[in-house]
UniProtKB/Swiss-Prot annotation:
One Pfam family named in its UniProt record: ZapD
UniProt feature coiled coil, ranges: none
Compartments it resides in: Cytoplasm
InterPro entries in alphabetical order: ZapD, ZapD_C, ZapD_sf
Main location as per UniProt: cytoplasm
Protein name according to UniProt: Cell division protein ZapD
Physiological role: Cell division factor that enhances FtsZ-ring assembly. Directly interacts with FtsZ and promotes bundling of FtsZ protofilaments, with a reduction in FtsZ GTPase activity.
Family, per entry: Belongs to the ZapD family.
Keyword presence, Cell division: yes
NCBIfam families documented for this protein: PRK05287.1-1, PRK05287.1-3
Length: 247
């Protein structure tokens, strides 16, 4: 049974973008196969959100820089006595290969942008009730096509995200595992510390505390205020133990 709740908070814009992309790609696979109108709207809304995120920044450039940075960090670890050099070399090779695939891939999201069905649905999503069958007969007929045909088309769409998804997963896994959790204590519901050029805060709280963190800050300094889920009757203990990793 789950006894701890994990919260993550980005400390810079690139990490904020990466976490949003990770979340949206995960959401694309939640309700597969797409078998009805509700499932289709969930899928296409996440596709539209993903394309919006892609258009706001240089996702590929930032990710390629991070792949190179992680390779340099691993190179430094090779010199440390007692480390698993084979494991480090395997990781470096995987990062290098992911970068090569990403840099040679088409523009991120371009395959999805050029798809007629995605474009039609995307145009209607901002209109309340704009995806009714009379607004989008194309979607209506698509939902009545054989399930195998829809599955194959969705698989093709998701495959176009594979170079990005693989590189992003590698980077985020390395960042998340770069620092262990350490026990910390807040006083009167408040905690602050130096970020030490961190990209990501990871925080674990006991589920039974029914508290959540409000986090503010950047890579050099951050502050956490703990809030009760029940804003009227909930209490925050004077001293609260929690686990924190500045990655």
């Amino acid at each position: 049974m789950l006894t701890q709740v994990l919260f993550e908070h980005p400390l810079n814009e690139k990490m904020r973008t990466w976490l949003r992309i990770e979340f949206l790609i995960q959401q694309l696979s939640v309700n597969l196969p797409v078998a009805d109108h509700a499932g289709a709207l969930h899928f296409f809304r996440n596709i539209a959100d993903l394309l919006d995120v892609f258009e706001r920044g240089e996702v590929r450039t930032e990710l390629l820089k991070e792949l190179e940075r992680q390779q340099r960090k691993l190179q430094a670890w090779i010199e440390v006595p007692g480390v698993d050099q084979d494991r480090i070399e395997a990781l470096r090779t995987e990062l290098k290969n992911a970068g090569s695939i990403l840099i040679s891939a088409p523009r991120i999201g371009q395959f999805l942008r050029e798809d007629r069905l995605i474009a039609l649905v995307r145009q209607r999503l901002s209109i309340p009730g704009g995806c009714c069958s009379f607004d989008l007969p194309t979607l209506h007929i698509w939902l009545h096509m054989p399930q195998a045909m829809r599955d194959a088309q969705i698989e093709t769409w998701l495959a176009s995200l594979s170079p990005l998804n693989h590189a992003l997963t590698l980077v985020l896994d390395l960042i998340r595992n770069s620092v262990p959790f350490r026990k910390q204590t807040s006083l009167n519901g408040f905690y602050q510390d130096n970020g030490e050029d961190a990209d990501l805060l990871r925080l674990q709280l006991p589920l039974d505390s029914q508290l959540y963190p409000q986090i503010s800050g950047h890579k050099s300094r951050f502050a956490i205020r703990f809030m009760p889920l029940d804003s009227e009757n909930g209490l925050v203990p004077e001293r609260l133990d929690f686990e924190l990793a500045c990655c």
